[in-house]
Design a protein with these regions (language model features):
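Membrane-interfacial amphipathic/re-entrant helices at transmembrane-helix boundaries
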Residues: 1-24, 36, 50, 59-71
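Alpha-helical transmembrane segments within multi-pass membrane transporters and channels
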Residues: 63-110, 265
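Hydrophobic core segments of alpha-helical transmembrane domains in multi-pass membrane transport
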Residues: 23-24, 48-52, 110-114, 158-171, ...
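Transmembrane alpha-helical segments in multi-pass inner-membrane proteins
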Residues: 213, 223-290
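Helix-loop-helix "hairpin" substructures at the membrane interface of multi-pass membrane proteins
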Residues: 150-228, 251-252, 256
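Cytosolic-side transmembrane-helix boundaries in multi-pass membrane proteins
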Residues: 186-200, 271-319
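Transmembrane helix-bundle core of multi-pass membrane transporters
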Residues: 109-174, 275-285, 312-319
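Short, non-helical or kinked segments that cap or interrupt transmembrane helices
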Residues: 28-50, 92-105, 180, 224-239, ...
């Protein structure tokens, strides 16, 4: 492998990892508050849909490609928050099973977005192509061998994802809000005793996860596919759940795991360049990221400690 190819491999890894970074970071906030969120896949699908529709109509209204793409990102975040409220109301207010509620979000996304896109685009199964984001090249730095192509020529969403990981870590471990959020996920009864509004913070955690997972879905639409269709997300939300668990519910850990899974998808593309790969069925090569997800989850069992009150319903009147 040449140095040029190595730089391109790292670059492609970050492209694939970005959506997983957003969604896994969102999952961390929800589950740190004690609310299991298996609906990341559905939230990403809704975000990808909102970004495709928002970006398309923004371009039709005369906005430039980048401006229209940011409209798509904003639309995805808002849509993600609204959909996450369904999960929050069901699991926090009405005490529904959190696992089932998250799965319902996934099924709802699969059916409703396909219906809505056909309704809005005259029976077509996609939004039509949009310009989306262009990569940003940082002058001079992009010319550095290997590192230039790898780190200094990227989509705006990649830089945003890295920034939010840093902010997410500092918020979780260095601020009063983060301490309160983690306390309601570890021991909600004790948190309630000292005056912390448990359910309010859990709502906030779920809404943050909705916004970030929605942006994760938007990232795929606006950088990789440049349109929305029913298979745009293709299981990235489930990989994000694995990244969250493998990263031990820590923003930095989730980031590292997301990059690992992004690498597994990037290497899938490069494996096909080698002659020996021609003897391997293409289906097996395309299964690689998902096989690694299963292997990582099995390896993480017993090694990752989830928040103590994760998945536990809390009723303030019964404390």
């Amino acid at each position: 492998m040449s140095w040029l190819t190595l730089g391109e491999l790292i670059h492609t890894t970050l492209v694939f990892a970005t959506a997983i970074i957003f969604a896994s970071l969102g999952g961390v906030f929800s589950e740190k508050s004690g609310v299991t969120n298996l609906g990341l896949e559905g939230l990403m699908v809704f975000g990808a849909f909102a970004a495709g529709v928002g970006g398309f109509y923004a371009e039709q209204a005369g906005l430039g490609g980048t401006s229209a793409a940011w409209v798509g990102v904003l639309s995805a975040a808002v849509f993600g928050i609204l959909v996450s409220l369904i999960h929050a109301v069901a699991s926090i207010t009405f005490k529904a099973d959190q696992v089932i509620s998250g799965i319902v979000i996934n099924f709802l996304a699969a059916g409703s977005t396909l219906y809505m896109v056909k309704l809005l685009f005259e029976g077509d199964g996609d939004t039509g192509r949009i310009q989306g984001f262009n990569e940003i090249s940082i002058p001079f730095l992009v010319d550095i061998p290997i590192a230039g192509k790898a780190f200094f020529q990227a989509y705006p969403t990649t830089y945003l994802a890295i920034l939010l990981v840093i902010i997410g870590y500092l918020t979780s471990y260095k601020t009063p809000f983060g301490l309160r959020l983690r306390s309601v996920g570890e021991h909600p009864g004790a948190a309630d005793t000292v005056g912390i509004k448990v359910n309010r913070l859990r709502y906030i955690g779920v809404m943050i996860s909705g916004a970030l997972a929605g942006i994760g879905g938007a990232t795929i639409t606006l950088t990789t596919t440049n349109m929305f269709s029913h298979n745009t997300v293709s299981g990235q939300g489930y990989i994000a759940i694995a990244a969250m668990i493998f990263g031990k519910w820590n923003p930095l850990g989730a980031f590292g795991a997301a990059v690992f899974f992004g690498f597994s998808q990037a290497i899938r593309n490069y494996v096909q360049l080698f002659a020996w790969s021609q003897s391997i069925p293409q289906e097996i090569i395309f299964m690689l990221p998902y096989l690694l997800t299963i292997i990582v989850l099995v390896a993480a069992v017993g090694r990752s400690r989830a928040p103590a009150a994760l998945g536990q319903l809390y009723d303030p009147s019964k404390r």
